[in-house]
Structures are given as structure tokens and as C-alpha cells.
Amino acid sequence: MRIHRALFVLLVWTGTLTFVEASHAQAPAAAKAAGAGKASKAGVPTLKPEVHANLGQLMKGILYPNSNVIFAAQDQNPADVKPAQDPSTAVNPLASSYGKWEAVENSAMALVEAANLLILPGRKCANGLPVPIQNPDWPKLVQGLREAGLTAYKAAQSKNQDNILMAADTMTTACANCHDKYREKPNLADRCK
């Protein structure tokens, strides 16, 4: 019995030492990984915005699909959309786990937040030209998108399709104002000029 107890104590002691050593060995690696960005005074890494997508990718990946959710709510009452067989994997936001009017609200807020992505320095248009954030009209056009998104959000909160019709009209105007100037060019190389 004494041998079993001694063996047990030895195993616990060895396990504790191993755990402590492993913890100390991982601490510098974790600290180094956490410090990938510059650390602030509080020791928290600071992050800077990074631009990875071009303007076309941003439009196709965020603005276009979220605008379509709002446009879809003009014709079909989101409250009447049946959930998908598996809402967690639904490709239609209106039939997803966060569907119905909530999907319209979320899409509107995605447009509002995406406006911030349109003013980040360093983004390129699909043709390689810089996004014209320095042009005097660009901030107004981006603000028009932001306001259209907020209008759509309020309309979605009201759960009223007449309000969505008006919000969609505001959104169409905001999109057209920018597209008419910077996108609708016969030659791709002339976009963003």
C-alpha cells in the first residue's frame, strides 16, 4: 500500500512539474504572437485597417448581395418567407436563421458599415486605379450610401413594405449617383476616373 501511495505522489509531482514547465514554455510564444502589432500603453496590440479587396470585390461581396435583400423585401413581405429546411445553411438571408425582417435590418446595417470600407486609403478599383477618395464628390457619395442604409434600417424596423419601397428608392438613387460618375463607362479602364 505504501508503494502505491509513493508511486501516486511521484506521478502527481511529475505531472505538476511537467504542467508548470509547459505553461512557462508557452507563455513567451503566446506573448510574441499577441504582440504581432505594436502594443499600446496598456499592452494591448493596436490594429490598423488593412485593405485586401478591390472595389469590385467589395461591391460584389458586400454591397450587391445586401442591397438585393432590401430590394427583395419590396416584392415579398419578409414576414411571409418560410425558413429554409436548414436555416443555418440557407443561402437566402430571408430564409436563414437570422431571416425575415431581421435579415433586412442586418443587410441595411451592412451597407451602413460598408460605407466605411469605401474611404479606406489604399483600395484599388477593379482596373487597378486608386479608389477616388480624394475627389471632392467621393465623401458625399459615400455619405449618400450610409444615409440610404440607415433609411433602409429604419424601414426594416417598421416592418412595413411601403417604407421599404421608399427606402429602396433612396438606395437606388445613392447607388446610381456613384455608378453614373465612376462605374458606367464603356471601357473598364475609365472606371474610377
Residue ranges and their predicted role:
Residues L7-T18:
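Bacterial N-terminal signal peptides
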Residues V20-A25:
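Boundary at the C-terminal end of the N-terminal hydrophobic targeting segment
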Residues A27-T170, E184-K193:
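Extracytoplasmic c-type cytochrome modules immediately beyond a signal peptide or single-pass transmembrane anchor
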Residues M171-Y182:
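The canonical Cys-X-X-Cys-His
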Residues M1-R5:
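Positively charged n-region of N-terminal signal peptides that target proteins for export
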